[in-house]
């Protein structure tokens, strides 16, 4: 169902028209696409890694059933679709250095499983129906605007929130652990740039 707090706020709300649609409701998605004459869908609906692990059924419903709905609407309405994947789609058996684009993906988390499925389902819709589907495997994304919400790299932001509040923070990551991260504005710019590129590229 509808997620309270999903409405755009502040600068985003003022930047143009907006509508709320539950990605698990195909008719609601189709209605918004038709009403606003949308030609590109940025499907960012997913539970973050930590939350997905504690609510696997909901993670699948939002991440995969929701994607199915978006892809069907895109097929029917002629839309392009961006759905981010993640380095969480890899697993312990994936090469850790110079990881190839096409490689073994055996994630051990529900979040990772949904991301592998996202890649495969998007490829299927491209090959079977010609839907222009595109994706990027993002690392953990951090933001100075959005508070932590259940992602693997949330500690990197949470530590600053704790410092501002004068609270003690115990880092859950073992010393010496390396984690890839990306700044939210850079991730958004990457998604937009990818979708604006000619499909032949």
Task: Walk through the language-model features, giving the residues of each.
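Glycine-rich "substrate-gating" loop/helix at the edge of Rossmann-like oxidoreductase active sites
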Residues: 108, 139-153, 173-185
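Short alpha-helix in the Rossmann-fold core of NAD(P)-dependent oxidoreductases
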Residues: 60-67, 74, 114-115
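Rossmann-fold cofactor-recognition segment
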Residues: 13-25
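Active-site Tyr-X1-5-Lys
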Residues: 92-95, 106-134, 139, 163-165
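NAD(P)H-binding glycine-rich loop region in Rossmannoid oxidoreductase-like domains
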Residues: 23-62
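Conserved Rossmann-fold NAD(P)-dependent oxidoreductase catalytic core, especially the SDR/UDP-sugar
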Residues: 37, 43, 68-110
């Amino acid at each position: 169902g509808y997620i309270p707090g999903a409405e755009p706020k502040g600068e985003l709300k003022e930047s143009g028209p907006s509508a709320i649609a539950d990605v698990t409701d195909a008719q609601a998605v189709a209605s918004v696409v038709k009403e606003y004459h949308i030609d590109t869908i940025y499907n960012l609906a997913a539970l973050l890694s930590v939350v997905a692990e504690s609510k696997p059924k909901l993670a699948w419903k939002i991440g995969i059933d929701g994607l199915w709905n978006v892809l069907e609407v895109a097929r029917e309405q002629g839309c392009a679709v961006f759905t981010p994947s993640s380095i969480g789609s890899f697993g312990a058996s994936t090469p850790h250095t110079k990881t190839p684009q096409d490689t073994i993906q055996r994630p051990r988390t529900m979040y990772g499983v949904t991301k592998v499925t996202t890649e495969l389902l998007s490829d299927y819709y491209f090959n079977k129906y010609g839907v222009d589907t595109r994706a990027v495997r993002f690392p953990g994304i951090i933001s100075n605007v959005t508070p932590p919400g259940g992602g693997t790299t949330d500690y990197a932001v949470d530590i600053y929130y704790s410092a501002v509040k004068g609270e003690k923070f115990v880092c859950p990551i073992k010393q010496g652990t390396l984690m890839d991260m990306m700044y939210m504005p850079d991730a958004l710019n990457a998604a937009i740039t990818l979708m604006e590129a000619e499909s032949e590229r």
